[in-house]
Amino acid sequence: MPKMKTKKSAAKRFRVRPGGTVKRGQAFKRHILTKKSTKNKRHLRGTATVHETNMGHMAQMLPFAGL
C-alpha cells in the first residue's frame, strides 16, 4: 500500500478546529472588486466553515488531521 500523504495545497488553505469542523477562507474577494458593493465585500471578510457534504473530501486530502 502506498504511503499516505497530505495534499499540501489543502493544508495551507484549511484549518481544523478542535470540534472537528474545518475553517476556510471566503471566495470571490481577490479581484474584480470594483463591481461589488461595500456591503457584499464586508460580508466576504473573515472565514467560513466547510459544509458537511465536503468533509469526506477533506478527510482524503488531510489524512492526518483527525477528521
UniProtKB/Swiss-Prot annotation:
Composition bias type Basic residues, residue spans: 1-16
GO cellular component: cytosolic large ribosomal subunit
InterPro entries the UniProt entry points to: Ribosomal_bL35, Ribosomal_bL35-like, Ribosomal_bL35_CS, Ribosomal_bL35_sf
Superkingdom in the source lineage: Bacteria
One GO term (biological process): translation
Keywords tagged on the record: Ribonucleoprotein, Ribosomal protein
Keyword Manganese assigned: no
GO molecular function list: structural constituent of ribosome
Keyword set includes RNA-binding: no
Region listing for Disordered, in residue ranges: 1-22
Record-linked PROSITE patterns: RIBOSOMAL_L35 (PS00936)
Family: Belongs to the bacterial ribosomal protein bL35 family.
Entry-linked HAMAP family: Ribosomal_bL35
Name recorded for this polypeptide: Large ribosomal subunit protein bL35
Species whose genome carries this gene: Methylibium petroleiphilum (strain ATCC BAA-1232 / LMG 22953 / PM1)
